Design a protein with these regions (language model features):
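Active-site acidic short loop of glycosyltransferases
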Residues: 4-5, 98-99, 126
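Catalytic active-site module of serine/aspartate enzymes centered on a nucleophile-bearing elbow/loop
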Residues: 127-156
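Conserved alpha/beta-hydrolase "acid-adjacent" motif
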Residues: 110-116
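Residue-level signal for the nucleotide or nucleotide-sugar donor/cofactor binding architecture
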Residues: 73, 112, 141
Length: 156
């Protein structure tokens, strides 16, 4: 927002405007309060479908692949991220984003419900919304679909 000339186009994936967002179901949020999923791979495998939706609900190979790649984060860093989500919001200045913006979101995203993508698209001028039939981790579960579409948007 401060230097729009530095950004020709913007792509926002599986995100919200911050604290003013429509939250996921409380049972999902309860699983996110702790960094346990980053520390306990069996726990991650058990909750991945509920937490991330999409292919994580139906494809055990995707769940295993994700659980094996996840890096442990520091508790401090994790809680700072939660704090940022709780107190920071971009809602009041989204209208100042002037460059063409592609908003990509999964229709089955339990963490950040799709209504949040619709809010972003309604508040950002020149925004295009691509609501996909997938979950929160579509960049990992569907890279062969997502990457070319993003490339096409950026090349326009």
């Amino acid at each position: 927002r401060q230097y729009p000339e530095r950004c020709r186009k913007l792509v926002l994936c599986a995100t919200s405007c911050g604290s003013a967002m429509f939250p996921g179901h409380p049972s999902i949020l309860a699983k996110m309060i702790s960094p346990r999923r980053y520390l306990d791979k069996k726990y991650m495998s058990r909750i991945a479908g509920d937490l991330y939706g999409g292919k994580m609900r139906t494809d055990p190979a995707q769940v295993e692949k994700h659980a094996s790649r996840v890096q442990t984060t520091s508790s401090r860093g994790y809680y700072y991220q939660l704090l940022a989500l709780a107190i920071w919001s971009s809602l009041h200045w989204l209208h100042k984003i002037t460059m063409p913006t592609l908003i990509v979101h999964g229709a089955d995203d339990p963490i950040i419900p799709p209504v949040n993508a619709k809010v972003l698209a309604s508040r950002i001028p020149n925004a295009e919304l691509w609501l996909m039939n997938c979950g929160h981790l579509f960049m990992l579960t569907m890279p062969d679909t997502v990457a070319p579409a993003i490339r096409e948007f950026l090349d326009r």
